[in-house]
């Protein structure tokens, strides 16, 4: 006799199904907070499994990386092609406190910059900020026609490209090595690109000069005090806003 399972005997009642449990019933929502250097602090919400036994929800949240458009963070659509990466470093209550983790361009913006009849110049610099963050900055630039030029093409010579790249490296090193990571994130969108464009005008005129990518290579030992200061926990909450205050001279009372 064959030994096996008798399918006829093991059948249960028809029509009964196992009750499906909602997976979101075991999860909690946390708010993602951007540093106070940005105009908009509330990035969005993230979900995580509730703390059960030795599995802590805070440990699951720490280290998460969120990609946000700079246009949403600064309320300015001119920065819509820049993507900012934010990393969760600390969880306080239902708030995830983040720090800058990198910057990148959208692929459609990069593709729109590359055109015919011009030279593409790229440079990358690894630099250490004053607060011991090791970052690598990638710069991109394109040649443009001179005001009196008749020729259609704007190809730069190899010697000119080398001279422009040298200037790009010098400016990026000077601007990045003398500032903190927070100050660097403010300079990256426009300031460094304009400085490069101005400095290389005598070699060959450039256009569309950008820091297209910022990569975080190494960070210092975690300091909760520095993170709280970055989020304005120990100071006023007007960081990230435009400074539009009038200067008023203090009048000292006579003693």
From Swiss-Prot:
GO MF terms, alphabetically ordered: structural constituent of ribosome
Subcellular location: Cytoplasm
One of the Pfam families matching this protein, by short name: Ribosomal_S3Ae
UniProt keyword list: Acetylation, Cytoplasm, Ribonucleoprotein, Ribosomal protein
GO CC term, one of those recorded: cytosolic small ribosomal subunit
Modified residues (N-acetylalanine): 2
BP-aspect Gene Ontology terms: translation
Comp. bias (Basic residues): 1-18
Region Disordered, residue ranges: 1-22
PANTHER family: 40S RIBOSOMAL PROTEIN S3A
Protein family membership: Belongs to the eukaryotic ribosomal protein eS1 family.
Subunit structure: Component of the small ribosomal subunit. Mature ribosomes consist of a small (40S) and a large (60S) subunit. The 40S subunit contains about 33 different proteins and 1 molecule of RNA (18S). The 60S subunit contains about 49 different proteins and 3 molecules of RNA (25S, 5.8S and 5S).
Name listed for the protein in its UniProt record: Small ribosomal subunit protein eS1
Species of the source: Uncinocarpus reesii (strain UAMH 1704)
Lineage, highest ranks first: Eukaryota, Fungi, Dikarya, Ascomycota, Pezizomycotina
